[in-house]
């Protein structure tokens, strides 16, 4: 996968509606799930108890936190596109987040991004993107969200 190169933040205005691409598949491990649980102090058994899930979970394996998948968006986005002449990018928010399918431990995920909007805002460009986190060999995605990023040149 090669990254889409954007020359400047204002150039996003010219590619509204364009599909920017998808990442390579990324394995989601129990180690990563446990690290996220530790960082957020969310130790719900469905995420961390590898024995209890065998008997008490419909998935029979642990699942990643929905917010873990969401938190991967900035890293995965950087694999899809790079903006030259960019001094700073700020996370401005996320809208319309839907956690559709659980990410079962040892599944592979990838992100796909489409530019929904780009407009002048607060001296920068407010970029709205549709991000889909897919699960390999799963009909439905893990999540779909509209991310807002403020880009400064």
Predicted features and spans:
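HotDog/MaoC-like acyl-thioester-processing domains
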Residues: 1-15, 103-153
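Short alpha-helix capping/helix-loop boundary micro-motifs
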Residues: 94-99
């Amino acid at each position: 996968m090669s990254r889409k190169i954007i020359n400047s933040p204002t150039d996003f205005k010219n590619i509204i509606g364009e599909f920017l691409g998808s990442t390579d598949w990324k394995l989601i491990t129990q180690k990563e799930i446990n690290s996220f649980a530790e960082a957020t102090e969310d130790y719900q058994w469905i995420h961390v108890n590898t024995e209890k899930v065998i008997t008490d979970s419909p998935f029979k394996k642990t699942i990643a936190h929905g917010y873990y998948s969401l938190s991967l968006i900035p890293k995965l986005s950087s694999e899809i596109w790079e903006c030259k002449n960019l001094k700073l990018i700020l996370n401005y928010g996320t809208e319309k987040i839907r956690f559709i399918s659980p990410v079962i431990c040892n599944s592979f995920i990838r992100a796909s991004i489409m530019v929904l909007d780009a407009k002048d805002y607060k001296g920068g460009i407010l970029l709205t993107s549709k991000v889909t986190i897919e699960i390999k060999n799963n009909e439905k995605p893990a999540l779909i969200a509209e991310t807002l990023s403020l880009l400064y040149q």
